């Protein structure tokens, strides 16, 4: 019987290397040093280990999966915590983190900013494959379509020969011509034609020929032409002067 009792009291032999392979779990207290809510990890500043205060705080790594709390898991900077940790090749890592007395952690008020997909604003351009407005040709789900005009979507011609595009451009060009014709002539040497309001631009050759004509004329002819020109100007100014007097 004594031998049996002695056999029961003996401790079972431990496997060699088991105690060395298993990391020792320790208990510590401290506060959150910093925590990145977007990446989900941070560090705890441990000020007490196994109930013994530390002269210099020690950093302990903490991951959001080790936090004891509901909802979005995070830590607020300076938040007091209690935790168990172990030694790893990378340093000290927390195993389970709670609030004081085993209560749930409070967590941070910050939330990671989600990646919002910016919707492309419609710019009026079409898909060159199907003509749709909500996508480009590289995003088109249809097989390659026959080539067609990008302006009117017709397969009978290309945009360079599109009659609809040419018809839309003609009114704009004719309007530009009308505006050019309605503007007064701003030439440095205007010539009055038949007493009207139109004018023509004298090119260098015309100026030379006109100067030659004046040189061939006699002084009497030149004076007579000046007199006719003065009479014409008075006739033009006459009605304007009468209208001003009536008003």
From Swiss-Prot:
**What is the first-listed, main subcellular location in coarse terms?**
nucleus
Gene3D superfamilies referenced in this protein's UniProt entry, alphabetically: Nucleic acid-binding proteins, Zinc finger, CCHC-type
Record field: compositional bias (Basic residues) = 112-123
Q: Which SMART domains match?
A: CSP (SM00357), ZnF_C2HC (SM00343)
Q: Which portions of the chain have biased composition (kind: Polar residues)?
A: 173-186
| Gene Ontology molecular function | RNA binding; sequence-specific double-stranded DNA binding; zinc ion binding
Q: Where in the cell is it found?
A: Nucleus, Nucleolus
For the region Disordered, give the residue spans.
1-22, 96-124, 173-247
Chain ranges of the CSD domain: 27-100
Judging by the UniProt lineage, the source's domain of life is: Eukaryota
Keywords for this entry?
A: Metal-binding, Nucleus, Phosphoprotein, Repeat, RNA-binding, RNA-mediated gene silencing, Zinc, Zinc-finger
Q: Which positions, given as ranges, span the membrane?
A: none
Q: Where does Zn(2+) 2 bind?
A: 149, 152, 157, 162
> Ranges of Basic and acidic residues compositional bias?
207-219
The free-text domain remark for this protein reads: The tandem zinc fingers, also referred as zinc knuckle domain (ZKD), mediate specific binding to the GGAG/GGUG motif while the CSD shows only limited pyrimidine-rich sequence specificity. Both domains bind single-stranded nucleic acids.
Give the similarity note.
Belongs to the lin-28 family.
Q: What does this protein do?
A: Suppressor of microRNA (miRNA) biogenesis, including that of let-7 and possibly of miR107, miR-143 and miR-200c. Binds primary let-7 transcripts (pri-let-7), including pri-let-7g and pri-let-7a-1, and sequester them in the nucleolus, away from the microprocessor complex, hence preventing their processing into mature miRNA. Does not act on pri-miR21. The repression of let-7 expression is required for normal development and contributes to maintain the pluripotent state of embryonic stem cells by preventing let-7-mediated differentiation.
Protein name as it appears in the record: Protein lin-28 homolog B
**What is the native source organism of this protein?**
Mus musculus (Mouse)
Lineage summary: Eukaryota, Metazoa, Chordata, Craniata, Vertebrata
Question: Which gene is annotated as encoding this protein in its UniProt record?
Answer: Lin28b
């Amino acid at each position: 019987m004594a031998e049996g009792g002695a056999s029961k009291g003996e401790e079972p032999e431990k496997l060699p290397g088991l105690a060395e392979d298993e990391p020792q779990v320790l208990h510590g207290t401290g506060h959150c040093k910093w925590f990145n809510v977007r990446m989900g990890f941070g560090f705890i500043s441990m000020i007490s280990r196994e109930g013994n205060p530390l002269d210099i705080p020690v950093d302990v790594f903490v991951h959001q999966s080790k936090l004891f709390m509901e909802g979005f898991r995070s830590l607020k900077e300076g938040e007091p915590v209690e935790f168990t940790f172990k030694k790893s090749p990378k340093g000290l890592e927390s195993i389970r983190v709670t609030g004081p007395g085993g209560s749930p952690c409070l967590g941070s008020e910050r939330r990671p900013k989600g990646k919002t997909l910016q919707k492309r604003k419609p710019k009026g351009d079409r898909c060159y494959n199907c003509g749709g407005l909500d996508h480009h040709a590289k995003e088109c789900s249809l097989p390659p379509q026959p080539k067609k005009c990008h302006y009117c979507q017709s397969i009978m011609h290309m945009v360079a020969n599109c009659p609809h595009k040419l018809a839309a451009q003609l009114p704009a060009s004719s309007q530009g011509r009308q505006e050019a014709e309605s503007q007064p002539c701003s030439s440095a040497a205007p010539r009055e034609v038949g007493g009207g309001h139109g004018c023509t631009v004298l090119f260098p050759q015309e100026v030379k020929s006109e100067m030659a004509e004046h040189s061939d004329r006699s002084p009497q002819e030149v004076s007579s032409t000046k007199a006719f020109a003065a009479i014409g100007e008075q006739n033009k100014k006459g009605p304007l002067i009468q209208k001003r007097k009536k008003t």
